[in-house]
A protein has these predicted regions:
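Intrinsically disordered, low-complexity Ser/Thr/Pro/Gly-rich regulatory segments
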Residues: 1-164
Length: 164
């Protein structure tokens, strides 16, 4: 079984959507490290005098041979209208941009803190958006691909899909 950090009881996870994903990731075999609600702080650009920006990856999955995978989880029933994402009547940030931004912020931090001895070209990395509550049949934006998107239909096999 995968190791979780922090190791929490699923019922203590505030958002049901993240709880569902946390439970599904419990099916990952040993060797995986799953970081939940992983915060990061980075300069806006790679300049030291730039303002800092904060972010949080819903899940970061690490494996010594398979690399790094960032999961962005969106509950409810997100839908794309034109070029804008909505959850109900409320506009929301593009989940695919969020996942990508989280991944690159983490990769930048790893490179920086390792003094460039660990470079992103040395391991596989990616990001995936998960809609655990809904079966999404709408269009996907051009900045993504169906292979990096999972909805409620994939939840029962989520761990197996990630382990592939």
């Amino acid at each position: 079984m995968a190791r979780f950090v922090p190791a929490v009881r699923p019922e203590d996870i505030e958002h049901d959507s993240e709880r569902l994903v946390y439970e599904a990731l419990g099916g990952l075999p040993s060797g995986y490290l799953v970081l939940h609600s992983f915060p990061w702080v980075r300069p806006l650009r790679d300049l030291a005098d730039e303002p800092l920006r904060e972010g949080e990856a819903d899940f970061v999955i690490l494996h010594p041979e398979k690399g790094l995978l960032v999961l962005e989880v969106k509950g409810g029933r997100p839908e794309l209208r034109g070029r804008t994402w909505f959850r109900g009547p409320r506009e929301m940030r593009d989940p695919f941009d969020q996942a990508r931004r989280n991944r690159y912020a983490l990769l930048d931090a790893v490179e920086e803190r390792s003094q460039r001895s660990v470079h992103r070209d040395l391991f596989t990395h990616g990001d995936v958006v998960v809609f655990p509550h809904s079966q999404y049949d709408g269009p996907l934006p051009l900045n993504t691909d169906e292979r990096i998107f999972l909805d409620a239909r994939a939840m029962s096999g989520l761990a197996a899909r990630i382990d592939d």
